[in-house]
Amino acid sequence: MAEAATEIPPTASNVTVFTFEEQATSSLALYGMSILCIIIGSIRSAQYIRTNIDKKRLIEGSITMREARKFPISASLVLFGLYLFFKPAAERFLWVARVFQILRVPEEYVQKINSTIISYTANTTTTGPSEPFLLRLASRIPQERVPEAIQNAATYAYTNLPTIQKAECMQLLTFLICFEGVNAFASLLKPFVTAFLKKMPLVPSFLRFNAPYLFSLKKGNKEMEEGDIEDAKKKETEYLFKIDFDRYDIIALLMCSPILISHLLKRHWITNNIIGVSFSILGIERLHLASFKAGSLLLVGLFFYDIFWVFGTDVMTSVAKGIDAPILLQFPQDIYRNGIMEASKHSMLGLGDIVIPGIFIALLRRFDYRVVQTTAESKAPQGSLKGRYYFVVTVVAYMAGLFITMAVMHHFKAAQPALLYLVPCCLFVPLLLAVIRGELSALWNYDESRHVDNEENRKKVDSGKKNN
C-alpha cells in the first residue's frame, strides 16, 4: 500500500482560514485515532501470533530481512506507477523527458523523445474528445506488416467492446480497497457477532452453529489421474490459493455491507474513517515483523523513502489526492461551521504513517510478553523474569513524534513526511531503553523467524507431526 503524507489545505487568498480551535480539533481527532489503532492492533497482534504458535501454525505474510530490504524499492515502484497513472498523457511524457535530461541522456535522444511526445499528444489539448493513445500508436504501424486477421479482430474489439478508461480503473480500485476495508471491519466485529448469536435467545439453531468453509485452488506437482489430486500426499501438491472462513464471517460481512455501499455512493469522512481504522488495526495485527533487525531495517528504508517522495517530488501528495479511496484518515476542520454531515475541508493522516510504525511497536509488545522465548528464559522459574515495558515507552515516543509532525505541518502549512519524525522516535527510544536496562543484545537479537511460513519451517512442522 502506498502511504499518503499528512497534509492540510494550502493557504491561498480564496481558501477559508480556520481558527486554532478548528485546526486543533481535527488534529486531535486524527491523533487519537492513530494511537487507538496502534494500541489495539499491537494487543491483537500479540494474541494472534501467540495463538498461531500454540496451534503450531506457521505465520503467513511475514516481513523478514529479505522482504525488508526490498520493501522501500517495491513501494517506490508501486507509488511511481500510480503517479504516472494519474498524470495526463502529455504531462507524463514530458516528465519522463525531464528525467532523461537530469540523467544527462545525450541531447539527440532527448530531441527524439520530445518529437515523439509532440507527435503522439498533439490532439490532447483540443476541446473535443482525444483519440486513444493506443489507437494512435497502432495507426503508425504499417498496415502491410499486420496480418489481416489481427486487423479484423482489433477493429471488432474497438467498435464493439466498451472502452476502459482511467475512470473505470479508478472505480475498480476504489471498490477493491473499500471491500477489503469493510472485510477488515467485519473481522473486528466478528467476536461481538459470535457472542450475540451464541448467547442471545430466540436465535435460530442453524445460526448458533458456526460452520467452517474452505475455498482453495490446489495444483499437483506431478501428473495424476483425474480425481487423484484430492487424496494426494501433501508433498505432491501445493495450494495456489486458499481462504478459510466460517458462517459468522459471512454474517459479519453482510452486517457491514451498508458501510461499503454508503461510502461508494457518498464518500463521507465517517465511513472513510471506519474503513481506514479497520484497515490499520488489522494491518498491525496481521503484518508480522519476523525480527527486531528486520523492523529496524524496514523503518530506516522507509525513512528515506518518505523524505524523498514528499520533499523531493510531488509524487506522494499527487497520489494521495488522486486515489479517491480510504487510504488515509480524515477529519473536517469546518465541522463547527457546517456540521458533521456537510463538513468537507479535511485534515488527513496517511494509513502508512500508522501501520508502518504500528507493526514495529507490535513487535515490541510481543518482546515485552516474551511470545518467543530464548532457551534461558524458557528454563527460568515462573515469575523470576523481570517485566518489560518497551511497548508503553515506544507508544509514548510515537505520540511525541506524531505531535511534532502535526506541529511542523501547521507551522509550514505544507505536507510533511511523517516518518521523518516518527522513525527516530520509534527506533532510538527503545534502543536507548535497552541500553539503560542492559537488554540491548536481547532486543537486537529478538527473532520470530522460526515461526514464519517458509520451506524450511514447513519441513520441520511436517516432520514434527510425523513423529507425533
UniProtKB/Swiss-Prot annotation:
InterPro entries: Peptidase_A22B_SPP (IPR007369), Preselin/SPP (IPR006639)
Annotated TM spans: 23-43, 71-91, 169-189, 248-265, 268-284, 297-317, 344-364, 389-409, 416-436
GO MF entries: aspartic endopeptidase activity, intramembrane cleaving
Catalytic residues (UniProt): 306, 353
Enzyme superclass (EC): hydrolase
Keyword Protein transport found: no
Mutagenesis or variant effect for residue 417 to A: Slight reduction in progeny number
Knockout or disruption consequences: RNAi-mediated knockdown results in late stage embryonic and larval lethality, slow growth and pharyngeal pumping, uncoordinated movement, reduced brood size, middle body constriction, and muscle detachment. RNAi-mediated knockdown in L1 larvae causes incomplete cuticle shedding during molting.
Membrane topology, from the record: Multi-pass membrane protein
Protein's job: Acts as intramembrane protease. In larvae, required for the complete shedding of the cuticle during molting, possibly by regulating cholesterol uptake via lrp-1. Involved in embryonic and larval development.
Name of the featured protein: Intramembrane protease 2
Species of the source: Caenorhabditis elegans
